[in-house]
Amino acid sequence: MGETIIEKIIRHNTGKAVKPGDIVTVNVDRCMIHDIFIPFVADKFEEMGFTKLHDPDKVVLIYDHLVPASQQDDTRHFHKGDEFVEKYGLTHVHRSAGICHQLMTEAGYVKPGDIAFGTDSHTTTYGCVGAFSSGIGYTEMASILGTGTMWIKVPETIKVVIDGELPENVMSKDIILRLIGDLRADGATYRALEFSGSTIENMSVASRMTMANMAIEAGAKCALFTPDEKTAEYCEIELNDYQKSLVGDEDAVYMKTMTYKAENFVPVMACPSQVDKIRNVSELEGTEIDQVFIGSCTNGRLEDLRAAAEVLKGKKVADFVKLIVTPASRKIYRQALADGTLDILAEAGAIITHPGCGLCCGRTGGILSDGERVVATNNRNFLGRMGTSKVEIYLASPRTAAACAVAGKIVNPE
């Protein structure tokens, strides 16, 4: 019988063939902790009685949610993290380089076929390069730090096939939002999403990253893309035989298969305050807005900033609308600075901020008040995420968000 991608990864890791529902213990190739959770992980690690890390080289600590500190208590997280680094000999530490999920692939920490866990729900992002990655809590992370292993239940797989050429103003964000709307917020709970088709093959790794990042919004345990030459170039590696084998077999057993024609996708938005509340942008046109946010681990990459700049070039952000742009990493910031992208955005009236999570998690500037509306490119629009519980958050692609910033209201990108 054939295997899905997730089944191949687990078999390679454990040396045993598996099927959905099996409980197995895997060897963890890489784990990530960010600044929000490091105090809790550190305390739980010592509470469990561990005195040393199983393998310090497999641990990555990234400060991103709270950088730079906007509240007095934020510095406690940094101090706790630095103490942990010094005490246990961590060498992979990033204090201001960008968002954790961007850095994990950008810096080469996760490779195709790896198994990785992180203390953040959007750890599913690394599936963009063909890795099995998922978010966990601080207790599980503390256990991994001490043992190097983690138990998992082998998930069923939902196959998503997308063929054809996308319309000009449609981005991968529109695809994943539509998929979440079709599946609903719990439609893929503890299941793997496996993406294939000509549309996926033609996508950049950055676009795949957007889709893998948001898989959790349908409840998915992970999202997986077959590694290809684009993956190899991005990861700066030559794919080995194992990595080349990470494609779903024709006779693999899937929970179900969802098929789409790329030409049928249109710009969409997730409406307040549910990520699966999806409507076409055309249905929302004319809705006035107060702010636009372009950034996050979902859409803060160079191609996202360039897409926004293409829309904004020669135009101005509407009066009384604030446009905040936050690159996902320092590397992306410098690339966008070097190629003139940031200059176009700044000339249009954008506020360019330091790399990091920024407004996505409601920190370090840009929060809104009662009755205000924001169009944002991040991954969640829950109540209170960007200010008070009476703020309305609409999730969209960078092209759509940029068009809305110019119009001062929700419009289709042109």
Regions found by a protein language model. Give the residues of each.
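Fe-S-dependent hydro-lyases/dehydratases of central metabolism
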Residues: 1-414
